[in-house]
Amino acid sequence: MATYFVGDLQGCYDELQLLLERVDFNPTQDKLYLVGDLVARGDKSLECLRFVKSLGNAAQTVLGNHDLHLIATALDIKKVKPRDRVDAIFNAPDFDELIHWLRHQPLLVHNEKLNFLMSHAGISPDWDLKTAKSCAAEVEQILQHGDFHYLIENMYSEQPDRWSPDLQGLARHRYIINAFTRMRFCYLDHRFDFACKSPLKDAPAELTPWFNLDNPLYKQIPIVFGHWASLVDEPTPKGIYALDTGCVWNNRMTMLRWEDKQFFTQSAVKNYSDF
């Protein structure tokens, strides 16, 4: 049995299949973890959704910002962006089933046996393990069983940009969603910056990646995440695994085998900007 992690798919189905063939993935024995953003911009988002769903217990994904946006468009809260190339999902006979399944995916996975945390964007620099898990569960409960329409309709905000345990209601839930699905750079006082998406060397001096801030949790448990394609080939601290290597931006898809920490890569098989 082997455990694999793979970076953002974003509709890049063919590259995923090539990686799974290369590692001889066996869904009856192996497990595949996905860091979220299964959909958007690639040409086979529908195939990605159907495939991951079809794996059942052999796969586990987390929600990414593009996944949440797809749910928002399915609820008629947001309009479909042509560049996202998700029309096939909306025309699919299993559309409702796929959106229901996606909405029931977690924001955070903590595997105590294999000793890892996985989310789409990372873990807030102000959270310990207990807080991260309770915050994820709080929003997951609403998305899966509560007034998810109201939450998704009101989640689009960059405020609050700093954590406080006193946050309540929508402000609290916005921060939680942004931490798990949108976070990249932070100020030294731990405020989020959502404007900068550049490589580390080009970032303003006052900004630092979330994983370089002082949080004991970052050294206690390995963290696997995606979301940040411009981190490709950038060094990260020990135990911090950045797996989004920009396949949909014509770079490559990255897979990590957990047991021996071996990486596998697959270059984009097509120029997605040509579509």
UniProtKB/Swiss-Prot annotation:
Enzyme class (EC, first level): hydrolase
Chain segments annotated as coiled-coil in the UniProt record: none
A biological process from GO: RNA decapping
A GO cellular component annotation in the UniProt record: cytoplasm
CDD domains assigned to the protein according to its UniProt record, in alphabetical order: MPP_ApaH
InterPro entries (alphabetical): ApaH, Calcineurin-like_PHP_ApaH, Metallo-depent_PP-like
Keyword Transmembrane: no
NCBIfam families cross-referenced by the UniProt entry: apaH, PRK00166.1
Membership in a protein family: Belongs to the Ap4A hydrolase family.
Cited function: Hydrolyzes diadenosine 5',5'''-P1,P4-tetraphosphate to yield ADP.
UniProt xrefs under HAMAP family: ApaH
Record's protein name: Bis(5'-nucleosyl)-tetraphosphatase, symmetrical
Gene: apaH
